[in-house]
A protein has these predicted regions:
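Short amphipathic alpha-helices and their capping/turn segments at secondary-structure boundaries
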Residues: 39-57, 111-118, 147-155, 177-189, ...
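Hydrophobic faces of well-ordered beta-strands that scaffold small-molecule active sites
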Residues: 3-9, 30-34, 58-62, 99-101, ...
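Active-site acidic/histidine proton-transfer and metal-coordination neighborhood
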Residues: 69-160, 245
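Acidic-and-aromatic substrate-binding clefts and catalytic sites of carbohydrate-active enzymes
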Residues: 9-18, 33-46, 66-75, 103-111, ...
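Histidine-acidic metal/acid-base catalytic patches
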Residues: 1-3, 17-23, 81, 85-95, ...
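Active-site regions of enzymes building and remodeling cell-envelope glycoconjugates
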Residues: 55-56, 122-124, 210
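N-terminal pre-domain/capping segments
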Residues: 1-86, 160
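Short, hinge-like loop/turn segments at secondary-structure boundaries
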Residues: 50-52, 76-79, 117-118, 142-144, ...
Length: 257
């Protein structure tokens, strides 16, 4: 496999530190993509210990809409930039391979671009989104879900691109496009980073199924994801005590690549 494989964890996942060390030493994965939960800086020294003592590399995923960061909402600018400062701490102190942001949900593309341009002293990538996400009483539209808006963000913000194949599939299905052709089109935007999980091939809503539990042609997807360097596995975790399911997913991916 030509990618560096990423294990997705959250900054509060102290329960996974021991198995993460074990799997790294067994070469099951190459780096950790750490979701920086807001107000969790007290956990940063624990992750720095993994980096220093076990030589584990890190990437950072910034908080997104569900954790309170929404670049598309002008009323959240001050809060968004405060969360960005926490993200910078994680990225700088862990010497992150990359840092990923979502553009926002429910607001305007112009506002997302305006706020993302205000993130200073941090090199980052934007991640493409599904077209819609379920909310409490309805559905909301995501910023950065169609090709033109993604291309515009990359051009005007000047950031890198993280291609989430599952998000792309959901967006394509909502737009009435062939999902595999859409993934191939997005790959022309030269992503450095990929995210992958399984889902129903016709899904419009995102899911993070284990590989083989959905109907996506994952071997075909992997053939389309060419040119990038990092591939983070975003499947669900079944246990709070171990990462055995991640071993299965990682091996599955390697077997079909």
């Amino acid at each position: 496999m030509n990618y560096k494989i990423g294990l997705k964890l959250w900054s509060l996942n102290e329960n996974y530190i021991a198995p993460a060390i074990d799997l790294f030493e067994r070469e099951v994965y190459d780096y950790i993509e750490l979701y920086a939960v807001p107000n969790s800086l007290e956990m940063l020294p624990k992750w720095k210990t993994l980096a220093k003592e076990h030589k584990i590399k890190f990437a950072i995923h910034a908080p997104h809409f569900s954790s309170g960061l929404d670049f598309s909402n002008p009323n959240k600018l001050k809060h968004n930039l405060m969360l960005c400062d926490e993200v910078k701490r994680y990225s700088n102190e862990l010497e992150a391979l990359y840092t990923v942001f979502h553009p926002g949900i429910g607001g305007s593309l112009n506002e997302s671009i305006r706020q993302m341009k205000m993130v200073q002293n941090l090199k980052f990538a934007m991640e493409n989104k599904p077209y819609i996400v379920p909310m409490n009483s309805s559905e909301a539209f995501c910023i950065g879900a169609d090709f033109n808006s993604i291309a515009r963000i990359l051009d005007e913000v000047g950031c890198e691109f993280c291609l989430d194949a599952g998000h792309a599939l959901c967006s394509a299905n909502y737009q009435g496009l062939n999902p595999y052709e859409y993934i191939a089109k997005l790959n022309k935007l030269n992503p450095k980073i990929y995210h992958i999980s399984d889902n129903d091939e016709n899904a419009k809503l995102d899911a993070h199924m284990h590989f083989g539990d959905g109907s996506i042609d994952l071997a075909r997807v992997l053939r389309l994801l060419r040119g990038g360097e990092f591939l983070a596995i975003e499947t669900i975790k079944d246990s709070k005590d171990n990462l055995d399911d991640f071993i299965i997913d990682s091996n599955y991916l390697k077997s079909i690549s």
